Amino acid sequence: MGEDVIDSLQLNELLNAGEYKIGELTFQSIRSSQELQKKNTIVNLFGIVKDFTPSRQSLHGTKDWVTTVYLWDPTCDTSSIGLQIHLFSKQGNDLPVIKQVGQPLLLHQITLRSYRDRTQGLSKDQFRYALWPDFSSNSKDTLCPQPMPRLMKTGDKEEQFALLLNKIWDEQTNKHKNGELLSTSSARQNQTGLSYPSVSFSLLSQITPHQRCSFYAQVIKTWYSDKNFTLYVTDYTENELFFPMSPYTSSSRWRGPFGRFSIRCILWDEHDFYCRNYIKEGDYVVMKNVRTKIDHLGYLECILHGDSAKRYNMSIEKVDSEEPELNEIKSRKRLYVQNCQNGIEAVIEKLSQSQQSENPFIAHELKQTSVNEITAHVINEPASLKLTTISTILHAPLQNLLKPRKHRLRVQVVDFWPKSLTQFAVLSQPPSSYVWMFALLVRDVSNVTLPVIFFDSDAAELINSSKIQPCNLADHPQMTLQLKERLFLIWGNLEERIQHHISKGESPTLAAEDVETPWFDIYVKEYIPVIGNTKDHQSLTFLQKRWRGFGTKIV
């Protein structure tokens, strides 16, 4: 960077080169940092703070102090949240004191590493920094007094660069504040000058699982968590894979449409950041190259993960309500409203009937215990089965169950049958000896329960003890006690809790409401018992399905 004053265009040329110099230091642009193939590279960075968390002390490990910043520069899309960087220090008083988003920040000696398929930055022990105020602010009070140990000495070149970065940042944010929306009738072009080809758009009624699709839609409902942003969108076309919204199942905030017209979209990373700041209910959006999949309840949903390398050119953008591409959506919306006014009672009656025929084994939601770790007291053999959810199993088509299916679930035990351990072994047929036979009601993170049967050799494999054998347990209290101690490893004090509720004349299912039993992986075989020569697939019903445990051992 020379002595002459440069403008925004020249700054963009410097950044687009990927690597550039200011004074004696060489810097890496944010986008090139995110795309570096060689990880654990030490770089210097210069950008705008797009988000941050104040410094705090870690409660575990070395108990270092840490602050997290998201650094942005013009090589990133406007909607991108930038590069995540964790700054660590043994002392809490020598980390940057950031007051607000928009401040220019220079970081010296940052290590880039790969984490969960994305790049993030970590500070080295000797890292240093320089921080400027938000120059677009009327007051320079946006710069707090900074701690001296890591503060870099900078000159006019660095301040000029910071000023230009802040100017471009201010221009980009003002575009959204003033409602200057991107015209979607032309190809999109980002700040780096890369233009993308036109995209093929679909109606929501045409999308299917496991594809990438693009569509226009109206935002019906939004909410967010610490991790992501969720919205429901519709183009007023119907898809049989969508969740059937009705006045009985949707929240009071749901204003329609009712039926299978709306799809849930979960947004992460830069898409999350963009929607939190610029999208509200009622807005029209264009979503490009989003991924579709079946959720844990068996319904279609859309996912937008971070895509800093632009491999898929995924995006969500607000669209001006006067765009001609929205005319058909508005027309279908008017027709939907008119039809509802003419026959809403019939629609509600139809939907309520469909809700009454829901799967009988899907339980009411209980207060979920967070999964901190999987117990070491359970192993599975073989270890090749793919992890799935109970809801996915319950919503699988019956006609595909001509052969048994095997699943791996991550669950906790919330109930069992019989209620007395003395009945866990029964006489075999013909009555010559005893065999194990009992069932565990398990629940996974989707808050759905499944009854899993353990019989004979599969149950013996679960118990996994030569000292505990099936017998008339009522006549062998010592054997029953050993069985109780063995099962304690997978269900904790659940048996005592259930017996406590039974002794008080209460329902034993109350024990499952705040259960804190261990989490573990269980193998389940799903099948329909063959009775006679049944080949009529149409006669199969959900209540014929069975689930048996296998390949699971307590150790």
UniProtKB/Swiss-Prot annotation:
Gene Ontology process terms (BP): regulation of telomere maintenance via telomerase; telomere capping; telomere maintenance
SUPFAM superfamilies: Nucleic acid-binding proteins
Recorded GO CC terms: chromosome, telomeric repeat region; cytosol; nuclear telomere cap complex; nucleus; shelterin complex; telomere cap complex
Pfam families, per database record: POT1, POT1PC
Keywords of the record: Chromosome, DNA-binding, Nucleus, Telomere
InterPro entries (alphabetical): NA-bd_OB-fold, POT1, POT1PC, Telomer_end-bd_POT1/Cdc13
Compartments it resides in: Nucleus; Chromosome, Telomere
A molecular-function term among this protein's GO annotations: single-stranded telomeric DNA binding
Subunit structure of this chain's protein: Self-associates. Interacts with ccq1, poz1 and tpz1.
The family this protein is said to belong to: Belongs to the telombin family.
Role according to the record: Single-stranded telomeric DNA-binding protein that is required to protect the 3'-end telomeric overhang. It binds the consensus sequence 5'-GGTTAC-3'. Regulates telomerase and telomere length.
Protein name: Protection of telomeres protein 1
Highest classification ranks of the organism: Eukaryota, Fungi, Dikarya, Ascomycota, Taphrinomycotina
